[in-house]
Curated annotation (Swiss-Prot):
Bias type Basic residues, positions: 207-219
Domain tr-type G: 345-512
One GO cellular component term noted in the UniProt record for this chain: cytosol
GO function terms (MF aspect): GTP binding; GTPase activity; translation initiation factor activity
Stretch list, region G1: 354-361
Main localization, broad class: cytoplasm
Location of the protein in the cell: Cytoplasm
Name of this chain's protein: Translation initiation factor IF-2
Keywords: Cytoplasm, GTP-binding, Initiation factor, Nucleotide-binding, Protein biosynthesis
Region of interest: G2: 379-383
Designated gene of the protein: infB
Length: 843
C-alpha cells in the first residue's frame, strides 16, 4: 500500500483537515498538519481501529425547521452505518462523518423552505421517478427509514479505506461524493412527501383540536412511512405502476428412498436380452452392462444372453430367479396320453441300404412287382420312396434310401425311423465305402441288420468273400456264431427273395413290434416337395395312432389341416394306421425331411407352436451365421492371397435331394476355392432366382427341374448361365472341374427345342399321341427327349414317332404343330412340355 498524506485523505473523503486530524488522534495516530504522511502501518492500524470495537456506529443530530412561520418541525437525523465483511479480498471499513449530518440537515431545511412555493413542490414530485432510478442502483448503499417525525438514515455509503491507493485517488473521491449526494436526495424526497401529506391533513382537520406538545402535529407512524417509501418505489422509470414481483415457486418433487432394496423374482428364458432383464429387475440397462463388464463380457442393451449368464447377473444384483420352461407349450400339446389305449402288433419298417448300383432298387422292384428303376435316371434312386408290400405272412413297409454318399443325411433319417435294415451287398463287388457307412448308421441307431448278398446269378459272384469282409467289420453271420442273418438273393431271377422276406418277418417277431392304433397320430416326414396346383406335399410314415382326413397336424415349423391323403399306390384314403406311408396335402409350407408329425386337436395351438419353433430356428440360424462370420474372419487373417468363391444357386425337385447335393458341394471347398451356396430350394427356376444370380454373380444349377419362360427371358437379357442335371455324379464332377478350372466353356448338353402338349390322342399302334405346338427351337426325331410337368422332369427317353399331319417328319420347327409319340410312356397330359436335347462333343 503506497503512502498518502493527511490532506489527500481528507480530500478523498470530503472531510475537513482538522476533523480528520481529530479522528486520527482518537485512534492513537498523532498527526499535526495536512502535509504529514500516513505510513502503510498507520493505515493498517486505522483500518483495524475502525473494524474493531463495533460494526455499527450510531450518530444523531436534531435540528428545527420552521413551517409557515408558526410551526416547527424537529428533524432528528439518525445515522447508522453497518460494515459488512463481504469478501476477504475486499475488506471494507467505514469512516465516521459527523460533519456531513449538519450539511445534510441544512440542505433539507433549504429544500423545505422551497416547499412553500407550490410550483416548485410539483416539480420536485415529478422528479421522484429519477430519484427512484438512482435509488434502485444504490439499493445496497442507502435505505432511509423515517422515525419519530424525523428521518432515520441507514447504510450510508461506505468509505473503503483499504482501497484508497495512490492510483485510485480521483475515482474514490468521485464515487464517495456521488453516494452522499444520492443519499441526501433520498432524504429530501421523503421529507417533501411527508410535508405535503401533513399540509393536506391540516387542511382537512381545521375544525379539530390543536395538537398537544407545541409540535403542531402527530408523530408519524414508522410503518406508514415505510409504506410511503414503498409506494414511491412502485413506479418504473417511465411513470408506469409496477406489479408486485413474486419469487417463482419451485415445485419440489420428493420421494422417500426405501430403506431396504426390493428383492424381485425374475423369470429368465433362453435368449433374454439385456433390456428385458433390466426391465424385469426395475433397473437401468446401463447397470447390467456395467455388471457384465466387470464379469469380463462386453455387451449392449439389445444383446441376447444365455440363461447361465442371466442367472449370474440376477444373483449379483441381489434378486431371485426362476427359469422359464420354453417347452411347456410343446409338452402340453405334443405329449399324448395313451394309457387308456391298447397296443397292437404292427408291420415292420424296413430300410434297404447299400452301395450304389448293388441292386437295392432292383430288389425292391422285384418285391413290389413294379418297374421303379426304369423311371429313374441312370438307375439311381434320387429320393426316399416309401412302399407297403403285402406278403403271405404279413405286411412290410420298405424305405428305399439312395446308395450314393451324397445322401448320407437322408440315409441317417431313414435309419431313425426304421426297425430293420436290409444291407444289400453285390456278390461280385464286395464291401464298398457306402456299405461301411450303412453299417455305421445301422449300429448307431441300434437297428438289427439282415444282409442280402445280391447278384449271385453272375459267374463272378463270390458270397464267401462278402461274408469274410463283413465279418472284419463286426457283422458276424449266424453260421459263424453271430446274430446277423445272411440271405443269398438275385434281384434279376428272384432267387432267394422269399427267404429274405421270411427272414425280415422273423426278425420283426423277435423285436415284438407294437404300436397304438387309436388316438392322435404321430409319425415322421419321409420326404416333402412343392407341386404346382397341389401346394406342399409331404410323405409321412405313421408310427402311432390313427391319422384321419381333416386332422390338424404339425410338422416341424409347418402346420395345417389334412385336406387329402394318398397311399403308396396313389389311391385316396380316409385314414392311415401305424407303419403306413401316406402322402398328405394341406400344410402351410414344405417341412424338412425327418421332421416329426403330430396331430393337435386345437388349430390355434398348432399355429402358435409352429410360430414358436420357427422363431427358435431363426434365432439359431442367426447365431450360427454370426459364429461362422467370426470364424471366417479369423481363418482369413494372415492369408496372402484372396480365397476364390464359386457361388451357386441350387434348385431341385424334392427337399431331400437338395439337402444332399448341398452337403456334397460344401464338402468340395478347399483353401483356394470355396463353394458358397447362396440359395437353395425346390421347384422350377424362377425370375427371382435369376435376379439373385445377377446380383451375386452366381451359377444357377437345376437338378431335375427347369426354368420357367420368364426366367429364361431374363437370363438371356442378363447373361445368366443355367446348368441342368439329372445325375448327381455329373453335377458333382462338373463343379469339381469348375473349381479346378478344367470345365470346358461349351455345354455338354444343349436343349435344341421345346414342344408344348395342347391335346392328347389315342392310337392303337403307338398308344398316347401328344398333339403339340413347337414353341422353341426345333424338334428332331432322332434326338433324346424329356417330359416336363410343372417344369419338373418326370420322364426321360426317346421319340417313337414324329408326324406333321399324317406324314412322318424328321424335324418340326418353331411355330408348327406336330404329333409326338413317346416311347414306353403313355402318361402324357395337356400342359406338359417335351424337351428335345442333344449331347455336344467336349473339347
Amino acid at each position: 500500500m503506497a503512502e498518502i498524506t493527511v490532506g489527500q485523505l481528507a480530500q478523498q473523503t470530503n472531510k475537513e483537515v482538522d476533523a480528520l486530524l481529530k479522528q486520527l488522534k482518537s485512534f492513537g495516530i498523532e498527526k499535526s498538519s495536512e502535509k504529514d504522511t500516513l505510513t502503510p502501518t498507520e493505515m493498517k492500524t486505522l483500518l483495524e481501529k475502525i473494524n474493531s470495537a463495533k460494526n455499527t456506529a450510531t450518530r444523531k443530530k436534531v435540528t428545527s425547521v420552521k413551517l409557515d412561520g408558526k410551526h416547527k418541525i424537529n428533524v432528528s437525523v439518525k445515522r447508522k452505518r453497518r460494515v459488512a465483511k463481504k469478501v476477504e479480498q475486499q475488506e471494507s471499513t467505514t469512516l465516521e462523518q459527523p460533519q456531513e449530518l449538519e450539511t445534510m440537515v441544512q440542505e433539507v431545511s433549504q429544500q423545505v423552505d422551497i416547499v412553500k412555493e407550490q410550483d416548485n413542490i410539483e416539480q420536485i414530485v415529478e422528479n421522484k421517478e429519477a430519484v427512484k432510478v438512482q435509488e434502485q442502483r444504490q439499493a445496497e448503499i442507502a435505505k432511509p427509514v423515517i422515525k419519530d417525525s424525523g428521518f432515520k438514515i441507514t447504510a450510508m455509503p461506505e468509505i473503503k479505506i483499504e482501497e484508497i491507493v495512490a492510483e485510485d485517488d480521483e475515482g474514490l473521491a468521485a464515487s464517495d461524493k456521488q453516494a452522499k449526494k444520492k443519499a441526501a436526495k433520498k432524504v429530501f424526497s421523503e421529507a417533501v412527501n411527508t410535508n405535503t401529506k401533513y399540509k393536506r391533513e391540516e387542511e382537512e382537520k381545521k375544525s379539530k383540536a390543536k395538537k398537544a406538545g407545541g409540535k403542531g402535529f402527530k408523530k408519524a407512524n414508522p410503518r406508514q412511512l415505510s409504506q410511503l417509501a414503498g409506494d414511491l418505489e412502485s413506479f418504473d422509470e417511465f411513470g408506469a405502476k409496477k406489479g408486485k414481483l413474486k419469487a417463482p415457486k419451485v415445485k419440489k418433487q420428493e420421494f422417500t428412498k426405501p430403506v431396504e432394496n426390493t428383492v424381485r423374482t425374475v423369470e429368465i428364458h433362453e435368449g433374454i436380452t439385456v433390456s428385458e432383464l433390466a426391465q424385469k429387475m426395475a433397473v437401468k440397462g446401463a447397470e447390467i452392462v456395467k455388471v457384465l463388464f466387470n464379469m469380463g463380457v462386453m455387451a449392449t442393451i439389445n444383446q441376447s444372453l444365455d440363461q447361465d449368464t442371466a442367472i449370474l447377473i440376477v444373483e449379483e444384483m441381489g434378486h431371485k430367479y426362476t427359469l422359464h420352461n420354453e417347452n411347456a407349450l410343446e409338452e402340453a400339446v405334443t405329449i399324448v396320453d395313451r394309457s387308456s389305449y391298447k397296443k397292437i402288433s404292427r408291420a415292420p419298417v424296413v430300410t434297404i441300404m447299400g452301395h450304389v448300383d448293388h441292386g437295392k432298387t432292383s430288389l425292391l422292384d422285384y418285391i413290389r412287382q413294379t418297374r421303379v428303376v426304369a423311371g429313374e435316371a441312370g438307375g439311381i434312386t434320387q429320393h426316399i420312396g416309401a412302399y407297403s408290400v403285402k406278403t403271405d405272412k404279413g405286411s412290410i413297409t420298405f424305405l428305399d434310401t439312395p446308395g450314393h454318399e451324397a445322401f448320407t443325411s437322408m440315409r441317417a433319417r431313414g435309419a431313425k425311423s426304421t426297425d430293420i435294415v436290409i444291407l444289400v451287398v453285390a456278390a461280385d463287388d464286395g464291401v464298398m465305402p457306402q456299405t461301411e457307412e450303412a453299417i455305421q448308421h445301422a449300429k448307431a441307431a441300434r437297428v438289427p441288420i439282415v444282409v442280402a448278398v445280391n447278384k449271385i446269378d453272375k459267374p463272378e459272384a463270390d458270397p464267401d468273400k462278402v461274408i469274410s469282409e463283413l465279418a472284419q467289420r463286426n457283422v458276424i453271420p449266424e453260421s459263424w456264431g453271430g446274430d446277423v442273418m445272411f440271405v443269398n438273393v438275385s434281384a434279376k431271377t428272384g432267387e432267394g427273395v422269399a427267404d429274405l422276406l421270411e427272414a425280415v418277418l422273423l426278425q420283426s417277431e423277435v423285436l415284438e413290434l407294437e404300436a397304438f392304433a387309436e388316438g392322435l397320430a404321430e409319425g415322421v416326414v419321409i420326404e416333402s416337395r412343392l407341386e404346382k396346383g397341389r401346394g406342399p406335399v409331404a410323405t409321412v410314415l405313421v408310427q402311432n395312432g390313427n391319422l384321419k382326413q381333416g386332422d390338424n397336424i404339425l410338422c416341424g415349423t409347418e402346420y395345417g389341416r389334412v385336406r387329402a391323403m394318398h397311399n403308396d399306390l396313389g389311391k385316396k384314403i380316409k385314414a392311415a394306421g401305424p407303419a403306413t406311408p401316406v402322402e398328405i396335402l394341406g400344410l402351410s409350407g414344405v417341412p424338412a425331411a425327418g421332421d416329426e408329425m403330430v396331430v393337435i386337436e386345437n388349430e390355434k395351438k398348432a399355429k402358435e407352436l409352429a410360430a414358436q419353433r420357427s422363431q427358435k430356428q431363426k434365432e439359431a440360424k442367426i447365431a450360427q451365421e454370426q459364429s461362422l462370420k467370426l470364424s471366417n474372419m479369423f481363418n482369413n487373417m494372415g492369408k496372402e492371397g484372396e480365397q476364390q468363391v464359386l457361388k451357386i444357386i441350387l434348385k431341385g425337385d424334392v427337399q431331400g435331394s437338395v439337402e444332399a447335393i448341398r452337403e456334397s458341394l460344401l464338402k468340395l471347398s478347399t483353401d483356394e476355392v470355396k463353394v458358397d451356396i447362396i440359395a437353395s430350394g425346390i421347384g422350377a427356376i424362377t425370375s427371382s432366382d435369376v435376379t439373385l444370380a445377377v446380383a451375386s454373380t452366381a451359377v444357377v444349377i437345376g437338378f431335375n427341374v427347369r426354368a420357367d419362360s420368364a426366367a429364361k427371358k431374363l437370363a438371356e437379357t442378363d447373361g445368366v448361365e443355367f446348368r441342368y442335371y439329372n445325375i448327381i455324379y455329373d453335377l458333382i464332377d462338373d463343379v469339381k472341374k469348375a473349381m479346378s478350372g478344367l470345365l470346358s466353356p461349351e455345354m455338354k448338353e444343349q436343349i435344341i427345342g421345346i414342344a408344348e402338349v395342347r391335346e392328347v390322342y389315342r392310337s392303337s399302334k403307338f398308344g398316347s399321341i401328344a398333339g403339340c405346338m413347337v414353341i422353341e427351337g426345333v424338334v428332331k426325331r432322332t434326338n433324346p427327349i424329356r417330359v416336363l410337368r410343372n417344369n419338373v422332369v418326370i420322364y426321360e427317353g426317346t421319340l417313337e414317332s414324329l408326324k406333321r399331319f399324317k406324314d412322318d417328319a424328321s424335324e418340326v420347327k418353331k411355330g408348327l404343330e406336330c404329333g409326338i409319340g413317346v416311347k414306353n410312356y403313355n402318361d402324357v397330359r395337356e400342359g406338359d412340355q417335351i424337351e428335345v436335347f442333344e449331347v455336344a462333343k467336349e473339347l
